[in-house]
Structure formats: C-alpha cells, structure tokens
Swiss-Prot record:
One of its GO terms (biological process) is response to oxidative stress. It comes from Saccharolobus solfataricus (Sulfolobus solfataricus). A motif (YPITP motif) lies at residues 254-258. Optimum temperature is 70 degrees Celsius. The keyword Oxidoreductase applies. It catalyses: a 2-oxocarboxylate + 2 oxidized [2Fe-2S]-[ferredoxin] + CoA = an acyl-CoA + 2 reduced [2Fe-2S]-[ferredoxin] + CO2 + H(+). It holds the Pfam family PFOR_II. PANTHER family: PYRUVATE FLAVODOXIN_FERREDOXIN OXIDOREDUCTASE DOMAIN PROTEIN (PTHR32154:SF16), PYRUVATE-FLAVODOXIN OXIDOREDUCTASE-RELATED (PTHR32154). This is 2-oxoacid:ferredoxin oxidoreductase subunit alpha. GO terms for molecular function: 2-oxobutyrate synthase activity; 2-oxoglutarate synthase activity; pyruvate synthase activity. Catalyzes the coenzyme A-dependent oxidative decarboxylation of different 2-oxoacids such as 2-oxoglutarate, pyruvate and 2-oxobutyrate to form their CoA derivatives. It is an enzyme of class 1 (oxidoreductase). The Tyr-Pro-Ile-Thr-Pro (YPITP) motif is important for the turnover of the reaction, presumably through its flexibility and mobility. Its EC number is 1.2.7.11.
Length: 632
C-alpha cells in the first residue's frame, strides 16, 4: 500500500512544519514515511511544496503522480493540478484567481498553464482548473472555506483573526489527514508537540478539529502495530549523527545551502558522552564547531584540528568546495586525515542553491592541481548517510588522506520515518590507524616511507613534526631532489593502492535484484530509492533488472564491477546530470561503457513513476537516452 500526498504554499508560510506534523501523525498510526521538500532560493513568498509517501513498509522515494494534493494558495493548484490522481483540497478564497494574476509564478510556468487550459477549452481561473480535474480526470474536489474556519478559531480561542490566521496550513493538513481515516488524536498530539507556546497549540488544535469535522474518510487506512521505536531522519541530520557517533571533535563550516543544516545540528549537540570500554566510566566531551570567515578558512581549520589528532571535518556545497580546493591540496600534500562532506546542488556558479544535482562527481574526484590520493564515498539513503559519517572519519584516519563524502541535495533535504533499529548504531566501530602518542623521539619521520605508504602519525605537541605545502622529505623539510620527489610522490599514491587492497570491493558496491538479469542498472546517491521502488513495480510487468549502486568512487571497485556487468545486454546509467558521469568513471576504470542512459538535470529529485517509465522506454522501446522532466 502506498499513498502519495503533497502540500504546497508560499515560502515561509509553514509548509515544512505542516508536512512534519502530518507525517508524524501518520507514523504514530504505524505507517512509514518518505518525504521531500522543494523550495525556491528566497526567504519568503515563492512556491514551496512537500511531497510525501505513506506506506505500510518503509518507502524509499516520492512519486510525481500523487493521490492527495492539499493547498492553501492558488499557485500550488496551478503548479501541480496535472499531478493529482484522487483528491484536491483547496480554499474557496482562491476560486476566482487567474493564473495570470499569480505574480510569484515564473512567466514560463504561467504561459504553460494558460496554454494548456485554453487548449483543453477551459478558462484560466482556479475554478476552471477544478472543472477540468472533475470532468477530465475524475478527481474528487473538496472546497473548504478557510476564512469561515479561521473566524471560528479566533472566536473559540479568544484571539484576533490575524493570530488565528497562523493556523491556516493546519486546516489543510487536518482535512487531508481525515481522508486517511486514521485516529484524530494522533494529529492533535503531533500539533501539541510541535507548538510549545500555549496560544499556538490552542489555535492549531481548534483549527484541526474544525477542519476534520467537514471531511468524510475516503481511504479508511487501518491502524497498524506500532511497537517499535522509530526515528525521523533527513540527510543532513543523518550525516551529522554519523559523524558524532564516529567520534567527531571538530567541525568547521561557512554557511551555504544545503550544507549548513548539518553543522547547525552538530552545534546544537556539541556535548557528547562516551563510555570507556575497559572501565565502563562515562566521560563528557565536547565537539568544537566553528563558523569560519570563508570556505578556505574552514578547510584549513579542519586540517589544523586533524593534525592535533582529533577527528575533524567540514561541510560545504559546490561553490564552497571550489574555494576549498587549494586547502584540500595542502591536506593532500601533508597527508591530513580530514573529512569534507560535500552536499551537491545545482551549478555552475551560484546555480540553483536549493535544487538537487549529481553534476559534481568528476569535480570531487579530480579537484586540485597535481596528483594526490583522496577517498570518495557516496550515500544513497539516510541509513547510509549515517554510517558514512563514521566511515569517512575512519577512512581518513586509517589512510591519512582527505575523504570526500558526497550527499546530493535530494538526499540532504528529504526525510524518512524508519525503525530506529535499521540504523544499526550498535555496529559502529572506530578505526584510528597508525597514531603514535609516545614517540620516544624528539623528531619524528612524519612522512616515513613505508611498505603500505602510511606513515606513523604523531599529533601536534607530542613530537617535533614539520608541515609545508612544498614537496618535502620524510621529516617534512622542503626537498626538491628528483629522487626524493619520486619516492614521496609514489609513497602518497601508494596509500590509495593500499586502500584498494584492504577495503573489500563488496563494501564499495550494493547489489539489488536479479543478478542473472540481462538488464543491469548502475547508479549512485539519491536515485537509488526511486529505482528500487520502480523495480518492485516493474517485477509485476515481467521486467526484473539488477541494480548496482556505487558506494565508493575512489578507489573504484573495478574488479567487482567487471564481474557484475559481464554479459549484460542492457547497462543503464541512471543519475542526475547531463553527461552520465558515473558511466564515465565506470568506463575509465573498467573499459565498460553504459549502453543506455536515464538522466535528469532539472534540479528536482528522481521519482519512482518517472524512473519506471524510463526503464520501460529503454528495455521495451530501445531508447538509448531518456531524459526525465518531473517536478515543479
């Protein structure tokens, strides 16, 4: 069972809060949630919406075609009316609003809406859209007089109408919640947990009760057993918690969308407690979080902290990473165990700050002048983002090299309500590598040439060590002799070879579905969920592909990829960029090139129904390159 639900409204009007109230209430009834928020890069006023999937088992994606659309403005209706399958809930106040009158709507969107409606023989008001939905698509339309309800709220709560108006979005979620047929008290509980101030809890509770009185249940979902602890995770929070569990002690950042939320979360949870495994003693510790003056300062601060022996990281997005590249090169030259969590958004330049992309894969793999090792991993869901927060810190300290953790914006700003046990927190392990505290020598060969390329690491203050951006000898002193250059160059690169030998290729790739299928799909990052959900539906239509999700791009799991792709008729690369960059990396490392591509670069996340149709277009129609366009 799956139901897709969407709420939309003006940026800053509480769309995100409303969706979380709704989702938590549904989760209290025993259901699982996956949701994604889309918003413009402005503070207030532009169109924002939240797309959410409800299921009796954990969903992994959203859909373009939705069962329920609930709105409290005209623009949401104009932007999304062709995505509605079952029900539209709307405010009667906007019935006579014309598409041409919505000033916040971009001209090309207005033009498209007007053209579509006129070609279908309708006018351009909300009422015309409603008539189209009822006659052409059989959608059930539920009008609600928001103002009438708000006046009653003001009267019952004894507040001014302007105060009661802040419960407008609660009317929308309450009406759609009642359609599901779930216990009303769960929604009330979710409201009171969200609004701590008594007056706002009161007006929103009254608004919800009045709205639900006007609606008859339509779906009649049964209440499911809810005896397991659940957790509400978005990608930013998952990565942050993973870092905290992984022993992070220093985080630097410069504010940038969509990376800032991770650092803000860590800043709000700076005090941590650890337990000594030998004595059982509980110890209090602190994570230092610094908002730097710019991104170059942020990466250099993190590198400096890492050299003291603590686990250190920074977080940024495309424009910020561009500025960090010089500092990352210094970290590469000095073999600094620093982690960069790279939240990928639309580029180039400022690009699309609040939209998703996977166009920075090649940049992450090759950024910086000269050649130096870096490990690059990519998360595909919230559980992986959690584990990768720790994994990145382990890899950085073990191999003494920068680690880049890729999280695309679609994963960062989506959230899921899942069983807490699926996180496997009890399986977290800390790996530190060759850290030497008592060196018994005043001066350490910090860059000692070893068989595996990894040298003893003494934290600053425990032995005399030297660091410079220049080429250096084993002690760290500047040295330009050709023989030394060759040895130190090879020593650094050898660490990546060591990592390639030691890290099982099976841990660098996830494989799903029918491994004997003639159809193999390769992907990375957030498209994973949409593909897996699409595969479930395709199985009923006789298409049973295999999915290969790449978890680590450097070092690349080339031997396993060759084995998995051997003899496949269809090798379909699915990702959110124009060139199919993962396919390019595959070809570079294995000589195997994808035969087909399903790509998307409009800044919106991949959705299961459009991915499903894309796979069918490849397998059944032989289309070599399918471009997806879903999302407003």
């Amino acid at each position: 069972m799956r139901i897709s639900w969407m709420i939309g409204g003006a940026q800053g009007s509480g769309v995100d809060t409303s969706a979380n109230i709704f989702g938590n209430a549904v989760a209290a009834s025993g259901y699982y949630i996956y949701g994604n928020r889309e918003y413009y890069s402005n503070i207030k006023g532009r169109h924002s919406y939240f797309n959410l999937t409800i299921s009796d088992k954990p969903p992994r994606s959203i859909a373009q075609q939705i069962e329920i659309l609930t709105s409290f403005d005209a623009e949401t209706i104009f932007q999304h009316f062709n995505e509605v399958k079952d029900v539209l809930i709307y405010s009667t106040e906007v019935e006579n609003t014309k598409a041409e009158q919505v000033q916040s709507m971009e001209p090309e969107i207005t033009e498209h809406v007007v053209k579509f409606l006129k070609e279908k023989g309708y006018g351009t008001t909300v009422k015309d859209v409603i008539n189209y939905l009822k006659k052409e698509k059989g959608v059930k339309v539920i009008p609600i007089d928001y103002m009438e309800i708000l006046k009653k709220v003001a009267d019952q709560a004894k507040v001014q109408l302007s105060v009661a108006d802040r419960a407008r979005n609660t009317i929308a979620i309450a009406a759609s919640y009642k359609l599901l047929g779930l216990k009303e008290q769960y929604l009330i509980n979710s409201i009171t947990r969200t609004f701590r101030q008594e007056v706002f809890a009161k007006i929103n509770t009254i608004a919800a009760q009045l709205a639900m009185q006007q609606i008859q249940p339509m779906y009649n979902l049964p209440e499911l057993p809810n005896n397991e602890e659940k957790i509400n995770l978005d990608g930013n929070t998952a990565a942050a918690i993973g870092k905290i569990y992984g022993g992070l002690r220093f985080q630097s950042y410069y504010p940038i969308t969509p990376a800032s939320d991770e650092s803000v979360f860590i800043e709000a949870h700076q005090t941590v407690f650890t337990v000594d495994p030998k004595t059982g003693e509980k110890r209090k510790s602190t994570i230092v979080v610094v908002q730097a003056e710019d991104e170059l300062a942020a990466i250099n601060m993190a590198s400096g902290a890492a050299l003291t022996g603590v686990r250190a990281a920074t977080a940024t997005s495309g424009p910020g990473f561009s500025l960090m590249v010089e500092g990352m090169g210094w970290a590469g030259m000095n073999e600094v165990p620093v982690v960069i969590t790279y939240y990928i958004r639309g580029g180039p330049s400022t690009g699309q700050p609040t939209r998703t992309s996977q166009a920075d894969l090649m940049f992450a793999l090759n950024a910086g002048h000269g050649e130096f090792p870096r490990i690059v991993i990519a998360s595909g869901d919230h559980v992986e983002a959690f584990h990768d927060g720790t994994w990145a810190l382990n890899l950085a300290q073990k191999y003494q090299t920068p680690v880049i953790h890729l999280v695309d914006k679609a994963l960062a700003n989506s959230y899921s309500i899942i069983p807490k046990k699926t996180l496997g927190m009890e399986n977290i392990r800390i790996e530190k590598g060759k850290i030497v505290i008592n060196t018994n020598t005043p001066e350490l060969k910090r860059f000692e040439i070893t068989e595996d390329g990894i040298s003893p690491f003494a934290p600053l203050g425990t032995a005399r060590v030297h660091y410079t951006g220049d080429e250096h000898d084993e002690y760290g002193f500047i040295a330009e002799a050709s023989e030394n250059r060759e040895k130190m160059y090879e020593k650094r690169i050898k660490k990546l070879m060591t990592a390639d030998k030691e890290i099982p290729e099976e841990s660098r790739v996830n494989v799903y579905g029918n491994t004997d299928s003639k159809v193999a799909i390769i992907t990375w990052g957030s498209p994973k969920g949409a593909i897996l959900d699409a595969m479930e539906e395709l199985e009923n239509e006789g298409i049973k592909p295999m999915l290969i999700q790449i978890r680590m791009f450097s070092p690349f799991p080339k031997n396993l990829m060759r084995k998995l792709l051997n003899g496949k008729e269809f090798i379909i690369d699915v990702e959110s960029n124009y060139f199919g960059q993962a396919g390019e990396v595959l070809k570079l490392n294995t000589g195997i090139e994808p035969t087909h591509y399903i790509l998307k670069w409009n800044g919106r996340p991949m959705m299961r129904d459009e991915v499903k149709e894309g796979i069918k277009a490849v397998v059944q129609k032989g289309e070599r390159r399918v471009v997806l366009h879903g999302g407003a």
